[in-house]
């Protein structure tokens, strides 16, 4: 936990924010539930789930199920899902993108991470316990307390990855409870005809100018990896939606904000490759690009989405070996393949190949970020004019930046629901406003916006935090220091992201602060905004040149404010004698000068900022002029004025950074993945 009392005293030392800061007692809040009162207090944002739970429990009894586990994902382990797959949201009322619920005959609980704790308190009714962790061991312990020995614990095996199933199985092993896969989804049964219909979007081919290579070249590369593998697999099973989309240079609109379509692919080493698409006719528009190799080893055979299990079962009757990624292939599909015919790795060769962008893909993503910066700069200038007049609320702000992005060339809309959060709402890391409940932006409060765009040439994601009044600068500056320290790091090849991510936290740690979410994630070329397996978590692959990742430290004080600074960076070769790597930041929007306390920065950090601002001027300035945005161009020149490097800078910060760098170089030699 945070040293809250000490921390509050520390913030009172900052004159610019001491006068306006008033601690808020939990009892005065009306935006979250209070289950201790009689009757319980529920905010308007909470959902009454009593009838849904009663119906689910009836269905559980009919199937002899004592505990039922419901995840937040779909059959492809997608983070963003269609309304039809939002089972957790329908059952609980919780709309966050990550969570797990368990229902027994007399209890119900939701597990989610710190990004969503306050959101859950706003959306859950008092039928639900909120468990502030995501550990499967914690879920299993709760289940063992709630379910007697001999009880059946069930889940839908087509909604849990192999890795997650194994974790549950291990956590419950020897407990006397049975983990029972149940292919009939009990939530779907209760949801009934109220469940949204399947998507019917068209699949289309990505124009050649926006692909790094042809799909035939990509297939040849994957087959080469199959031949070179010691196990010589005969097929690769692709179940991540972005895998099939990337491999065949196809896109669709089955999931909001994500240009993907429901599909599986079984890529074999011979003439048959099956693309299982929801409603085969939906793929007719792109059939020409796929059938060009028929007959022969590059002939794509289209099959119905619902046939994947039967086809996989039939294929594995032969003398075959199927390669799959256990992190995101479902236990339901995995269970069809005989154990001796499996090649299990965390990620498929398609997933790892997609993560490393070639030179063409890198240029496409850079270009997308230049135009995206134009839209964000337009938004910042608009905010400066309109917020002091009280004309903007969170929802209208989100709508405005979405519209600015849509006006840019090659735009396909936002890459996720825009996070537009002022004051205490910014303490919710993934808060999104609605038309019905939206705070007015104020010059006296922090405003955090985390937004992104989908363009034919790339996907973007950027967060800026701004303030138009007398600000609290220390928290913002320490978050910025973390962003800078990780962005300018030089590190050995093959370094695991988890070994360096603490640099983004160090300036916060120095004063006993932290943040609860991850430091970064991969990003796609007109694909997913959160692209596996790149990032700084323990199950991410080692960093390699050509990978793109976000760098996004933050700091949040519940009920008061939130700060996050996010940029997208490309892993590139460093200018060193031996093969080392570093980051090239491709997000090109200046930070809020009003919030930067230069006295906390080292001279190296200020020099980095000045170099970054020079790059922004060089790359975004001409694009603003090309689009005849003269006022925005002048705003950019003013906002990227170089910072003074001199006596105001503390030498301690420099010395400490040098000491940390030398320590890190020693640590990294033993921590490479």
Named regions from a protein language model:
Residues 1, 9-20, 656-668:
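Cleavable N-terminal signal peptides of Sec/SRP-targeted secreted and luminal proteins
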Residues 644-659:
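C-terminal GPI-anchoring signal of eukaryotic secretory precursors
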Residues 6, 17-647, 668-672:
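Active-site neighborhoods and metal-handling regions in enzymes and metal-associated proteins
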């Amino acid at each position: 936990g945070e040293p809250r009392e000490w921390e509050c005293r520390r913030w009172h030392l900052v004159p610019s924010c001491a006068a306006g800061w008033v601690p808020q007692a939990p009892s005065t809040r009306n935006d979250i539930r209070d289950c201790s009162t009689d009757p319980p207090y529920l905010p308007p944002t909470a959902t009454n789930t009593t009838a849904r739970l009663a119906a689910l429990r009836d269905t559980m009894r009919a199937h002899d199920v004592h505990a039922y586990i419901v995840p937040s994902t779909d059959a492809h382990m997608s983070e963003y899902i269609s309304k039809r797959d939002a089972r957790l949201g329908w059952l609980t009322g919780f709309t966050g993108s990550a969570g797990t619920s368990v229902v027994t005959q007399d209890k119900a609980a939701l597990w989610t991470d710190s990004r969503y704790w306050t959101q859950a308190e706003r959306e859950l009714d008092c039928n639900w316990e909120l468990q502030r962790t995501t550990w499967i061991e914690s879920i299993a312990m709760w289940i063992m307390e709630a379910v007697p020995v001999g009880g059946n614990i069930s889940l839908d095996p087509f909604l849990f990855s192999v890795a997650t199933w194994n974790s549950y199985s291990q956590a419950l092993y020897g407990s006397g409870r049975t983990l029972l896969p149940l292919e009939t989804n009990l939530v779907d049964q209760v949801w009934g005809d109220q469940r949204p219909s399947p998507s019917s979007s068209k699949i289309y081919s990505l124009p050649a100018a926006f692909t790094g290579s042809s799909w035939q070249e990509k297939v040849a590369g994957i087959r080469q990896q199959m031949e070179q593998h010691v196990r010589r697999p005969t097929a690769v099973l692709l179940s991540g939606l972005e895998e099939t989309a990337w491999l065949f240079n196809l896109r669709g609109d089955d999931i909001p904000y994500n240009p993907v379509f429901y599909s599986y692919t079984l890529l074999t080493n011979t003439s048959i490759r099956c693309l299982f698409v929801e409603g085969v006719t939906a793929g007719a528009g792109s059939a020409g690009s796929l059938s060009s190799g028929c007959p022969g080893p590059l002939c794509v055979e289209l099959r119905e989405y619902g046939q994947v299990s039967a086809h996989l079962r039939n294929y594995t009757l032969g003398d075959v070996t199927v390669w799959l990624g256990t992190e995101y292939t479902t236990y339901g599909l995995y269970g069809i393949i005989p154990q001796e015919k499996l090649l299990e790795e965390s990620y498929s060769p398609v997933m790892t190949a997609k993560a490393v962008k070639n030179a063409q893909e890198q240029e496409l993503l850079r270009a997308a970020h230049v135009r995206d910066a134009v839209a964000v700069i337009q938004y910042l200038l608009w905010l400066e004019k309109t917020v002091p007049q009280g004309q903007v609320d969170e929802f209208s702000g989100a709508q405005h930046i979405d519209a600015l992005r849509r006006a840019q060339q090659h735009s396909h809309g936002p890459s996720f629901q825009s996070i537009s959060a002022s004051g205490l709402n910014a303490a919710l890391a993934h808060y999104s406003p609605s038309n019905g409940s939206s705070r007015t932006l104020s010059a006296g409060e922090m405003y955090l916006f985390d937004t992104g765009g989908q363009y034919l040439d790339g996907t973007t994601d950027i967060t800026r935090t701004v303030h138009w009044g007398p600000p609290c600068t220390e928290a913002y500056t320490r978050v910025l220091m973390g962003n800078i320290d990780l962005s300018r790091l030089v590190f050995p090849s093959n370094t695991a992201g988890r070994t360096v991510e603490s640099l983004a936290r160090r300036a916060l740690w120095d004063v006993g602060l932290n943040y609860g979410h991850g430091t970064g994630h991969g990003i796609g070329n007109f694909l997913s905004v959160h692209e596996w397996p790149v990032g700084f978590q323990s199950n991410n692959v080692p960093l390699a040149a050509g990978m793109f990742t976000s760098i996004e430290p933050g700091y949040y004080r519940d009920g008061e404010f939130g700060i996050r600074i996010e940029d997208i960076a490309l892993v590139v070769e460093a200018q060193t004698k031996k093969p080392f790597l570093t980051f090239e930041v491709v997000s090109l929007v200046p930070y809020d000068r009003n919030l930067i306390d230069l006295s906390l920065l080292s001279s190296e950090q200020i020099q980095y900022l000045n170099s970054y601002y020079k790059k922004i001027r060089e790359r975004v300035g001409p694009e603003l002029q090309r689009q005849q945005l003269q006022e925005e161009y002048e705003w950019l020149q003013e906002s990227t004025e170089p910072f003074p490097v001199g006596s105001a800078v503390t030498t301690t910060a420099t010395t400490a950074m040098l000491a940390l760098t030398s320590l890190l170089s020693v640590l990294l030699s033993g921590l490479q993945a």
